[in-house]
Amino acid sequence: MTETKDLLQDEEFLKIRRLNSAEANKRHSVTYDNVILPQESMEVSPRSSTTSLVEPVESTEGVESTEAERVAGKQEQEEEYPVDAHMQKYLSHLKSKSRSRFHRKDASKYVSFFGDVSFDPRPTLLDSAINVPFQTTFKGPVLEKQLKNLQLTKTKTKATVKTTVKTTEKTDKADAPPGEKLESNFSGIYVFAWMFLGWIAIRCCTDYYASYGSAWNKLEIVQYMTTDLFTIAMLDLAMFLCTFFVVFVHWLVKKRIINWKWTGFVAVSIFELAFIPVTFPIYVYYFDFNWVTRIFLFLHSVVFVMKSHSFAFYNGYLWDIKQELEYSSKQLQKYKESLSPETREILQKSCDFCLFELNYQTKDNDFPNNISCSNFFMFCLFPVLVYQINYPRTSRIRWRYVLEKVCAIIGTIFLMMVTAQFFMHPVAMRCIQFHNTPTFGGWIPATQEWFHLLFDMIPGFTVLYMLTFYMIWDALLNCVAELTRFADRYFYGDWWNCVSFEEFSRIWNVPVHKFLLRHVYHSSMGALHLSKSQATLFTFFLSAVFHEMAMFAIFRRVRGYLFMFQLSQFVWTALSNTKFLRARPQLSNVVFSFGVCSGPSIIMTLYLTL
């Protein structure tokens, strides 16, 4: 089957229009029928193939023979390597993909779709910097010993070597000799900080016991944490089991019952788009859950959707790659002698890239053997949101380390409950009273009271914010990683040293950042053809929407405060990139730390009072 095209609509043949001269012997129309398009023609002008009639226009003399020779030459080349319409469209598709598949500077190097996210055996930050040194190399104070050794070295040097010191010129250099550095271990401060928080919690508990006795079950936070546990567990289990729908879809594709490109893709997309809208009203409105339960179920449902999406579209991409490999290989074998050298090269590159992509993570080519309920279940257990066939694993489970993290989880939850009950709950009740008093004696007293509430909220909420971060991203994720022998423990970076919120958004929650990088940022650039700046804006916008939904799950009302604060990070990023702040990283870190300590408290106070 050949593709027909009116050459008069192609830029290559625009000069032919001048053949229709207004002089004698003019031609009223020039029509070409049944033209076999070469590959170059499809790439330059991929318009629909039709036969048309063009009105005669003015032309110059002497052009007819030149254009006729060119057309004849092209027709001879096309007849030598005929390509059908479907193949022509397929080749055009491959050429459009080549820009993202090959390195810009070296066309022989492939660029994998999976190269944006990597997993390597890495320890978590607090373990490598504090916990491990404290348990393995801690020997008490070391600074005094270093000073004594340094003094002893200087004394021996003076006794053996005579030196001349010039003191006539002043200098600003430090007195310490170059290469000599004093080091100390700060593990003791880490222990002291936890001891300090523990004694505060014990003091609060003893004060409550002296006033109310052993009626611990009457505490509001305790009631929040201990009610409807069975219902919550069953609902969470039901949502988890629903995510196996994506495994069922890919199993159907594996058995060639359906095709991923159309049926599978649409089915998974509908499932993901409907998952949160269907489950959200159940735990927010249908069940009379407290706000702690609502936010837990919402965040867990988002995790389920993210894991399902990563599993589904990772394997969906490999289905497309596998199908491309089969088709390109088939065409190379079928038309081995009749294809042009350029077409043969395109198809061969397609086969090479597909093999490279299928073997990118493992030489065993486990796809599609990885599509199973057990594989998806194991992925759901891993403390990661981006799916791939293989992950770095440890050789064994360190049960002492697991016990340490379990104790850290229990102890941190206890500290969080004490902080929430005795430091935040009274302020929250005052905020609700403020919200229920519309006038509050005028706007000036109301403003003063609002700032008073904010200042009371900041200390307790900042402590709760830090404890929540430690409990989830260090204690909980490391405990799960150890139980599953997941070797990459890089769940967060040193975000406390950030000088901009742009850095903070990347390293404070590495699992979510990796998911957004692959499945939102890069996918939006590929599927929606967005630029880098547009993809960045789209990623932040989507993240802000889910943050606002989390606030709705807690307060059951839409205010948009957190949504606006999320998007305001663009402003803070622009300010941190100014020449003034870039030259002063210490000041930038102070500004960042002020925002981290005050921002969450401002948002919480706004939602409670306004």
Swiss-Prot record:
EC numbers: 2.3.1.-
Active site feature: 547
Keywords, alphabetical: Acyltransferase, Endoplasmic reticulum, Membrane, Phosphoprotein, Transferase, Transmembrane, Transmembrane helix
Region annotated Disordered, chain positions: 41-81
Gene Ontology CC entries for this record: endoplasmic reticulum; endoplasmic reticulum membrane
Residue ranges of the motif FYXDWWN motif: 491-497
TM annotation in the entry: 182-202, 229-249, 264-284, 371-391, 409-429, 535-555, 590-610
Compositional bias segments (type: Basic and acidic residues): 67-76
GO biological process: ergosterol metabolic process; sterol metabolic process
Domain of life: Eukaryota
An MF annotation (GO) of this entry: lanosterol O-acyltransferase activity
A Pfam family hit: MBOAT
Localization (cell): Endoplasmic reticulum membrane
Protein's membrane topology: Multi-pass membrane protein
Family recorded in the similarity comment: Belongs to the membrane-bound acyltransferase family. Sterol o-acyltransferase subfamily.
PANTHER family per the UniProt record, alphabetical: STEROL O-ACYLTRANSFERASE, STEROL O-ACYLTRANSFERASE 1-RELATED
Job of this protein: Sterol O-acyltransferase that catalyzes the formation of stery esters.
Protein name: Sterol O-acyltransferase 1
